[in-house]
Structure formats: C-alpha cells, structure tokens
C-alpha cells in the first residue's frame, strides 16, 4: 500500500488560489494527497495533470483518485519533461503548478527499494525503476573524486573524503551490494565523536547517492524554469523542499524571475521581455506547525515557497 502523509497539504494547495475550472499540474504525485485535495476543489471543467516516474505511485493514485478520472491525467515521467508532455497534450498555459520534492514515505519504507539506511537491502535508490543507473553502480564503480564531489555537494558531508576513501578500500576486496554494508563502511569512516551527534551518520551520504542516482537537482532546475514559463498571468506555483540544496534552487529561480534583467537607467518604458515574470508571495518560506511535525516527523525540514506569475 502506498500510504504517505502529505506535508503542508492545505498551505501548498490553498496557496495556488484554485479556480474551479482551472488547469493545474502536480509535478510530484506521490501518494496523491495534494492531488486529491486539489481535485476536490475543481468543477467538471477543471483539469489536473499529475506527474510521477514511479509506477508504484501511479498505480496507487489511480485507485485513490478513481472518482476524479475525468478530470485527472496521469503522466508517468520525470517532471523535467513537464513542458514537452503538456505540449504533446495541447496544453501551453496553466493556472497552477505544485512541486513536493524528496522521497515519499512508501519509497523509504519499502526495504527493497534501497532508499533507507534503516533496512538492509540491495543498493538501488531508483525512483524510476526502468532506468539503468543504481546506487550499486555509483558505490562500486564511480571514481574516488566523483564520490567526494557528490558526498560534499549533494550531501554536505564534511567527512566526504574519508567516506570515499573507505569505500575505495572495501570495494578493492569485495563488491558493496547492500545498504547495510554501506552503512557499516560509513560508520567506520566517520570519526566517533561526529557519529554521536547530528542524526544517523549515513543520512547525508544516502541523500547524496539518491540525488546522484536520480539526477534530482538538475531535473528540478530544468522543471522549475519550465514551470514559471508555463504559468498564465495570475497563475501560481507552490514548491515544497526538504533540504537546503533544493530550497536554494527554488529561492534563486524565484528571485531571478521576480527581478527581471538589469536595465540601463532612465528608460522611459520597460519592454515586455524585460519585465519581471514573478511576484514572490512568501517573503519567508512557510514551515509546518509543531502539531504537524508531531504527527509526521518527516515534515520537520519542509519549506514551502509560493510565487505568482505577473
């Protein structure tokens, strides 16, 4: 069962100012929580396009959202193909777009998917199970320098070199096949005082490998640019992030689109192509309430940013 507690449900969807007959996109369908709440506010003329590259998520959501089948279109593809997929369906402008980034609870809680450092499972971590690159390939075949790069930049791990060196040592002797083996290697590589603070010692390394396997940051950069372009005037975009790397991409994209390019001073009229594209609605990101965090500890690091197309 693809059970998943939706984070910042009302805040993210209500922030889109839903029009009953509008066209909306949920770029991260997951368990279907945001989509269900959004669909409940649409009339028969409203439309929702829901993206997910995980076949498990699509199958579950089709059942959950069966009563809205005339209003929802499921698209099993990475959201980096947002514009391409909508254009293919004759959609060139939309009223609202939602991103809820990060791994869904069912992916984390299904041991054989290999996302979690709490279960021993094959090193996989693919959100799209048809792609070839897995966590096993990265851990066993990527060179030391590449491992250091992803651990430091995607995991913000200060012991990146030590972990990469330990992986290199171990894989010379035997293949590293499971998440459990990798956790043991990470624990050996990180100094004892550091292991005792700051959460699970494998958290940052697992995040880094997952981001690399799924090319998450580049995919999001491409998708958010397309999303801003696709919005109608007055349309809104809600983005929920779970770590600083994603949040930075969102913050920069919103800031750049809300400022417009630098212009020479003294222009009597600003040409349309130089006007800002967005107005930022959330000066500071919206974060979950203490009550929400108490009910769903995975919501703790969530941040919601909203912007409106001018």
Swiss-Prot record:
UniProt enzyme class: transferase
HAMAP family linked: 16SrRNA_methyltr_H
Matches recorded under CDD domains: AdoMet_MTases
Annotated localization: Cytoplasm
GO cellular component term, pick one: cytoplasm
Biological processes annotated in GO: rRNA base methylation
NCBIfam families cross-referenced by the UniProt entry: 16S rRNA (cytosine(1402)-N(4))-methyltransferase RsmH (TIGR00006)
InterPro entries for this protein: RsmH, SAM-dep_MeTrfase_MraW_recog, SAM-dependent_MTases_sf
EC number in record: 2.1.1.199
Name of the protein: Ribosomal RNA small subunit methyltransferase H
SUPFAM superfamilies: Putative methyltransferase TM0872, insert domain, S-adenosyl-L-methionine-dependent methyltransferases
Catalysed reactions listed for this entry: cytidine(1402) in 16S rRNA + S-adenosyl-L-methionine = N(4)-methylcytidine(1402) in 16S rRNA + S-adenosyl-L-homocysteine + H(+)
Family: Belongs to the methyltransferase superfamily. RsmH family.
Keywords: Cytoplasm, Methyltransferase, rRNA processing, S-adenosyl-L-methionine, Transferase
Main location: cytoplasm
Gene Ontology MF: a single term: rRNA (cytosine-N4-)-methyltransferase activity
Binding of S-adenosyl-L-methionine, residues: 32-34, 52, 83, 100, 107
Cited function: Specifically methylates the N4 position of cytidine in position 1402 (C1402) of 16S rRNA.
């Amino acid at each position: 069962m693809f059970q998943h507690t939706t984070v910042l449900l009302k805040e993210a969807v209500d922030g889109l100012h839903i029009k009953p007959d509008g066209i909306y996109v949920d770029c991260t369908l997951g368990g279907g929580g945001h989509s269900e709440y959004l669909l409940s506010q649409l009339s028969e003329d409203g439309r929702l396009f829901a993206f997910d590259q995980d076949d498990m998520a699509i199958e579950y959501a089709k059942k959950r959202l069966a009563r809205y089948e005339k209003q929802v279109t499921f698209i099993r593809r990475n959201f980096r193909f947002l514009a391409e997929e909508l254009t293919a369906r004759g959609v060139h402008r939309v009223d609202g777009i939602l991103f809820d980034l990060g791994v869904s609870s069912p992916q984390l809680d299904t041991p054989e998917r290999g996302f979690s450092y709490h279960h021993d499972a094959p090193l996989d971590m693919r959100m799209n199970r048809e792609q070839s690159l897995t966590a096993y390939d990265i851990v066993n075949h990527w060179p030391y320098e590449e491992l250091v790069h992803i651990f430091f930049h995607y995991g913000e791990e200060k012991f990146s070199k030590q972990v990469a060196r330990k992986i290199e040592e171990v894989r010379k002797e035997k293949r590293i096949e499971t998440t459990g083996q990798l956790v043991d290697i990470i624990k050996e590589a990180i100094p004892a005082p550091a292991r005792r603070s700051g959460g699970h010692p494998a958290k940052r390394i697992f995040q880094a490998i997952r981001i690399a396997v799924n090319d998450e940051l580049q995919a999001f950069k491409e998708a958010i640019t397309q999303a801003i372009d696709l919005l109608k005037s007055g349309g809104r975009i809600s983005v929920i992030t779970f770590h600083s790397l994603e949040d930075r991409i969102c913050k920069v994209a919103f800031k750049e689109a809300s400022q417009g390019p630098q212009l020479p001073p003294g222009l009597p009229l600003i040409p349309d192509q130089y006007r800002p594209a967005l107005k930022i609605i959330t000066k500071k990101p919206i974060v979950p309430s203490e009550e929400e965090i108490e009910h769903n500890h995975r919501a703790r690091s969530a941040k919601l940013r909203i912007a409106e197309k001018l």
